[in-house]
Each structure stands twice: as structure tokens, then as C-alpha cells.
Amino acid sequence: MKSPAPSRPQKMALIPACIFLCFAALSVQAEETSVTPQPPDILLGPLFNDVQNAKLFPDPKTFADAVPNSYPLMILADYRMQQNQSGFDLRHFVNVNFTLPKEGEKYVPPEGQSLREHIDGLWPVLTRSTENTEKWDSLLPLPKPYVVPGGRFREVYYWDSYFTMLGLAESGHWDKVADMVANFAHEIDTYGHIPNGNRSYYLSRSQPPFFALMVELLAQHEGDAALKQYLPQMQKEYAYWMDGVENLQAGQQEKRVVKLQDGTLLNRYWDDRDTPRPESWVEDIATAKSNPNRPATEIYRDLRSAAASGWDFSSRWMDNPQQLNTLRTTSIVPVDLNSLMFKMEKILSRASKAAGDNAMANQYETLANARQKGIEKYLWNDQQGWYADYDLKSHKVRNQLTAAALFPLYVNAAAKDRASKMATATKTHLLQPGGLNTTSVKSGQQWDAPNGWAPLQWVATEGLQNYGQKEVAMDISWHFLTNVQHTYDREKKLMEKYDVSTTGTGGGGGEYPLQDGFGWTNGVTLKMLDLICPKEQPCDNVPATRPLSESTTQPLKQKEAEPTP
């Protein structure tokens, strides 16, 4: 079956209709076979609320991760009987009735390790195995071992894992890559989608959809067999993201799908629940109370949906960058998400062809082509000269430049002339001494200036290289690696995020202290080390001078700073 010509839109519409009906069936099948564990705020009701509001623990995630020692209903009944008694001690009650998460052992690396040796030594430290969990544990079991980010993040996270897996592959740990792909496929088969992380309280949302890219990565080692093996799960994930599309009218939205007035289909981030997040309970309640002009449930949904984006939180989602309570994630069509959906459609087409289903391959290709046109039409700001998010309320592309603008280049969805403009905008507005800024706005949120994040550095580097912008790509990698190296030289750690306004300093902002470990930084650092150093002369540390330079970029001086405690 040949893909219909672009000049005949009436037939193009028939193909998506057919394919979406198939996906609707897949989605229903996933829901019917799934077992959905209840999150702790539902299991424990008023007890959960009271413990979190009492701020018994510095990190609210601690109690969200605590395991009840008996049936939650029995614990709740005991609490109701005891809570008004004289001398009742809530902390003692929690200690008796729950097993609190243990602090991970402090990893002390051997003296004299290079950056590469340190990362290679961290893989077993960050590996977890949870084939079985306690009945009421919020942790969801997975059949294979997996690598966690580190620090307070004791579970596997969806989009983090892709960049971690890049590093595992670079280290030759293809068995771990295969294990993690198998785990995510298991989650799709069990829950109908890949949750934010393997916790019951993350099941109501997903994260940036990298599963198809993970399968594509595994196919580099296993060939088309990997594509064919995981085609059913990729189709199910696509069904999850497109759930509800068959009933949409022009100008409507349903869950994660948006249908614009001209019929263009795009996606947004969404969480199925509209309550405070268990892992950030008190903070979310305070945010909602701080804006009485909006329904609390609306704010909760937008907070949760921002967590689904991975960018929690950023001025990108807010009307007022200084007020988190003005975020409205669900009314924004993100450029990075739709780039990933385009890539998913392209990989689904490739996998279908590998499986011998050329008709289905053509249908996915048609969907990818339509989405690419939508990206170019709605997610490009011609006045500013960069890709940006689309605002469903104003019906306009937004003006803000963020590092997400590089995603169309990363997935090869950008027009060549626009890629050139993106290179100029990136170098002019986002490139800093220590890497790529997330945005140019200083809001105090962690996904804003001056923070830089490893996954965004890699997306920008690869995206610019895809379009021949090698000098800007090399500048980004070199600046970020220098930052990582300077921090490592002083702290002997790799950080979750970095201050890119200088070098040698971890990032700030956000709802929790800076975390070290750190899965995706490890992965991106290895990829960048192998990018800037020739294969015949691999480097274990960042070189003192910028390799392969055709620009005037000079080695960066290390910032004098005190070690973080």
C-alpha cells in the first residue's frame, strides 16, 4: 500500500482514522489487563494528609515512600481511635506502623579516579533490583535490574533513563540497556503506559516519551530484531498518548491530545489526577492556596502535568515567571513533546516495515509527515527566529526561547533554514560559559536560568550536528564538560544539574536539595567525552584545551568556590 499523496487530504484523513481505531482497541486492552496499585494518599486518606502537613520529615517524599507494616485500613482505623487521645505522638505512631526508606550508603570513590573511571564505577552503585515488593509498598516491582538517578531518587525514572542508557551503551553494558528496555515494556503491558517512575503515585502520568528511542538504541546492538520484538509495546504507548483522538472535534483537547481548528493533531502533557502530588504534598497545597482566583484542582493538574513534562518547574509554563501559581501546563502545546511524538511515529514506521507490515509502515509515515507540518506551522516563531511552544489560550506561538527548541533538530524534523536560525539563536541567547542555559529567565525554578541539565545539552549537541552546525555543537559540549570536570575535580561527584553561568558549581532552585549521582549526567558525560576526543585517542578526563577547534573558544578557568557539604 502506497502512502497517499499530500495533495489529497481526504484520503490522508482516512488512514489516521483507521490507525486510531486500532490504537483505541490497544488502549482498552491495556486498561482491561492492568492492575493499578493505589497511591499512598488514597490508601491512607486523612492520615497521609496529617503526616505530610505536620512536616515530620524534611523531604515529603520520605513518607510517600514509606511502607505500611499492615493493612492500610487497619492502620487508618487505629489512627482514628488514637489521634485525639492525650499524649498521642504522631511521629511515634508513624515509626511503629511504617517502615521508612533507608538512606543510601554514601559512596566514596577510590582516590585518583578519572572522570570516566568514576562513572564506570558508579553503574553498579546505582543499580537496583525489585522483582518483588511489599504488598502496600508504593514501589512498583520490575522484572529486571535497573539504574536509578541517585540521591533521593530511589526508583527508575522514565525520561532520565534514556540518557542513562546512552552512557551504559557507551560503556559496553548492553545487557543493562536490554534489561531497562524490557522493564519499560513490562510497564506498558501492565499499566498501559510508562509511568513517571516506578511508584504507585506516579501512575497517573507519564514523562517525555523516549521508549521508541530506547528501542532504536537497543537496535544498534541487536539489529531489527529489537524493533520487531518491541513493536507491540511501542504501539501501545502511542495509543496511550493518542487516547481520545477519535472523538475530538476541531478546537478540542482530550487528555494528552490536542486537535487544532484546522484539524492538526498535536500533543500536550497531562496528569489524570487533580490532587496534590503525594511526593510534594504540602508544597502543592501551599501553591494552590496562594492563588484563590483559580480552582485548586486546576492548579494541581497543571503542577502534575508540569511534572509529566520533566520540567518541574519552569517559567515556560507560567504567565508570571515569579509566581508558580500562574502555571498552566495543560494549555500549552510543547515543542519537545511533539518532536518526540514525530520520532515515535518514524520509529514505528521503521519497526512496522521490519516486521513486514508495509501498509502500517505507510500509515505511521503519514502521521509523522502530518505532525512535521504541524510543528513547522504552529511551533515555529517566525518573528523571533526559533522554535517555541504553542499557547492554546492565545492561539499563538509563544515568544520564549528555551532549550526545548532544539528538539526538532534532534529528531530531524526541522527545516534546514530554520536549523541555521536555531544555531544562531542558541549561540546568542542560551550558550553560557558552563553550557547551555535551560531558559534565559531567572525565576528561582530549577528549569530556568542559570541551570543547565545534561539531557538538554545532549539534545542540543546532537540536534545541531544533525544539521551541520558542528562548531556550535562542539561549543556546547566543551563548555558543559568543562563545568562537569571542574565540579568533579573539587567534589568528586557528578550532579543532577549545573549552574552554567560559570563552571564548577552545581545548580540550585527547585523543591529539594541538589542531588548527586547522577544517572543522566553520567550518560551524557560519557557520550560527550567520546564526541570531543578522537577514537584513536579516547580521553578519560576533559582535555585542558578544546579539541578540534576552529573557533576562538579558550579553556575555561575554574571558579574558586567552597565544596558543597
Swiss-Prot record:
Binding of substrate, residues: R152, W159, D160, N196, R205, S206, Q207, R277, P278, E279, G310, E511
Keywords: Glycosidase, Hydrolase, Periplasm, Signal
GO MF, any single term: alpha,alpha-trehalase activity
Active site: D312 (proton donor/acceptor), E496 (proton donor/acceptor)
Highest taxon above the source species: Bacteria
Location within or outside the cell: Periplasm
Signal peptide start-end: 1-30
One GO cellular component term: periplasmic space
GO BP term (any one): cellular hyperosmotic response
Span list, region Disordered: 538-565
Primary site of residence: periplasm
Enzyme Commission code: 3.2.1.28
Record InterPro entries: 6-hairpin_glycosidase_sf (IPR008928), 6hp_glycosidase-like_sf (IPR012341), Glyco_hydro_37 (IPR001661), Glyco_hydro_37_CS (IPR018232), Trehalase_periplasmic (IPR023720)
Pfam families, per the entry: Trehalase (PF01204)
HAMAP family registered for this protein in UniProt: Peripl_trehalase
Role: Provides the cells with the ability to utilize trehalose at high osmolarity by splitting it into glucose molecules that can subsequently be taken up by the phosphotransferase-mediated uptake system.
Similarity remark: Belongs to the glycosyl hydrolase 37 family.
Subunit structure: Monomer.
UniProt-recorded name of the protein: Periplasmic trehalase
UniProt organism field: Escherichia coli O127:H6 (strain E2348/69 / EPEC)
